[in-house]
């Protein structure tokens, strides 16, 4: 499909600087631009590329002021990254979607399948499962007994949704995601550990994204809940009875122990670890590799283990980097003190 700058500007409510008849048919990073491509500039680090990019159209923020002549047609918008997302979504929606049920898929007689559903080869749909309209289930995906999946969902190959779990509308589950495996619950005894049956479920509300090889464990009792709009990256572990607030985002390798409550609009960097049975307030930002042993109030910005404010953390990091030199200096000072003591004692 081909679009002109005029059509794109109308769709994203932007201002054209240049040729309104410039056309594009593909997307490209600004540093890899080519004729017929649309790119974007939102990170100032990439500003030098805008003067040499071969892209036909570039989305920029309204406050961008060129320092040199630019070959490309510019479209100025409030938020270039957000506008790019709108265009990419339009591009995705224009692609033809798979439909129909492959003859090699297994669907239990009691399962209920909505309209315009795609179920790929060797997918398994269990007894009393419900699949909503326009949902796509790719090959080799397992949907257990009693599972309910809403409308417009996308489950890529090798997703596993255990029995009785619930998935809302427009959720995306990437390959290898496991929803509803047993929580890590064991009772210590003199002879070892007795397994505690995990009889709860997992609930994913609307527009939740789950990354590849991420696990969301079922509750011991009740439900592990991920609220609407939350986005979870690859290789994340969410334990039994956790509750993740709406629109919270977590980068890869975050680990959350059981019964933690995470607020809305939080942002966790990669490899953050959260202790169990604590509460993280709304809009908390945690830097990568932070270890969180206790509850945190809303609107906090922390990094490190133990967690501290970024300014204090980076000061401590400088001190840590200089520890070998400081140790050497202290040893020399101790040696000098001992020599002075010996002189004074003579």
Curated annotation (Swiss-Prot):
GO biological process per UniProt? lipid A biosynthetic process
State any single GO MF term: N-acyltransferase activity
Q: What residues form the catalytic site here?
A: 240 (proton acceptor)
Q: Which CDD domains match?
A: LbH_LpxD
According to the UniProt record, one GO cellular component term is:
membrane
Please state the Enzyme Commission number of this protein: 2.3.1.191
Name the pathway.
Bacterial outer membrane biogenesis; LPS lipid A biosynthesis
- Record's catalysed reaction(s): a UDP-3-O-[(3R)-3-hydroxyacyl]-alpha-D-glucosamine + a (3R)-hydroxyacyl-[ACP] = a UDP-2-N,3-O-bis[(3R)-3-hydroxyacyl]-alpha-D-glucosamine + holo-[ACP] + H(+)
Report if keyword NAD is assigned.
Answer: no
Keyword annotations from UniProtKB, A to Z? Acyltransferase, Lipid A biosynthesis, Lipid biosynthesis, Lipid metabolism, Repeat, Transferase
Superkingdom is Bacteria
- The main enzyme category here is transferase
- Statement: the UniProt record of this protein carries the keyword Lipid biosynthesis: yes
What family does the Swiss-Prot or TrEMBL record give for this protein?
Belongs to the transferase hexapeptide repeat family. LpxD subfamily.
Describe the function of this protein: Catalyzes the N-acylation of UDP-3-O-acylglucosamine using 3-hydroxyacyl-ACP as the acyl donor. Is involved in the biosynthesis of lipid A, a phosphorylated glycolipid that anchors the lipopolysaccharide to the outer membrane of the cell.
Q: How does it assemble?
A: Homotrimer.
PANTHER family xref list: UDP-3-O-ACYLGLUCOSAMINE N-ACYLTRANSFERASE, UDP-3-O-ACYLGLUCOSAMINE N-ACYLTRANSFERASE 1, MITOCHONDRIAL-RELATED
List the protein's name. Answer: UDP-3-O-acylglucosamine N-acyltransferase
Q: Which organism is it from?
A: Bacteroides thetaiotaomicron (strain ATCC 29148 / DSM 2079 / JCM 5827 / CCUG 10774 / NCTC 10582 / VPI-5482 / E50)
């Amino acid at each position: 499909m081909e679009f002109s700058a005029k059509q794109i500007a109308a769709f994203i409510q932007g201002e054209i600087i240049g040729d309104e008849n410039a056309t594009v048919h593909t997307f490209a990073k600004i540093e890899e631009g080519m004729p017929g491509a649309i790119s974007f500039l939102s990170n100032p680090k990439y500003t030098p590329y805008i003067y040499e990019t071969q892209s036909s159209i570039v989305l920029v923020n309204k406050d961008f002021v060129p320092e040199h002549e630019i070959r490309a047609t510019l479209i100025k918008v409030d938020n270039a990254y957000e506008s790019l997302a709108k265009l990419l979504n339009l591009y995705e929606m224009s692609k033809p979607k798979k439909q129909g049920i492959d003859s090699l898929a297994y669907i239990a007689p009691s399962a209920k399948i909505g309209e315009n559903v795609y179920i790929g080869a060797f997918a398994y749909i269990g007894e009393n499962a419900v699949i909503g309209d326009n949902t796509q289930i790719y090959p080799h995906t397992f949907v257990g007994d009693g599972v309910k999946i809403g409308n417009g969902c996308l489950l890529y190959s090798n997703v596993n949704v255990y029995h009785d779990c619930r998935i809302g509308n427009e959720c995306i589950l990437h390959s290898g995601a496991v929803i509803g495996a047993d929580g890590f619950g064991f009772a210590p005894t003199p002879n070892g550990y007795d397994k505690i049956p995990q009889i709860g479920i997992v609930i994913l509300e609307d527009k939740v994204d789950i990354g590849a090889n991420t696990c969301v464990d079922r509750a011991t009792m009740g439900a592990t809940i991920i609220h609407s709009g939350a986005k979870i990256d690859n290789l994340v572990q969410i334990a039994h009875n956790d509750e993740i607030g709406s629109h919270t985002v977590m980068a890869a390798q975050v680990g959350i122990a059981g019964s933690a409550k995470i607020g809305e609009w939080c942002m966790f960097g990669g490899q953050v670890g959260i202790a169990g049975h604590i509460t993280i307030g709304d809009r908390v930002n945690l830097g990568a590799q932070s270890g969180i042993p206790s509850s945190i109030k809303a609107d906090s910005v922390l990094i490190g283990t133990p967690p501290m404010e970024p300014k204090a953390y980076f000061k401590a990091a400088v001190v840590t980097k200089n520890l070998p030199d400081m140790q050497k200096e202290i040893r020399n000072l101790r040696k000098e003190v001992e020599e002075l003591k010996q002189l004074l004692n003579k």
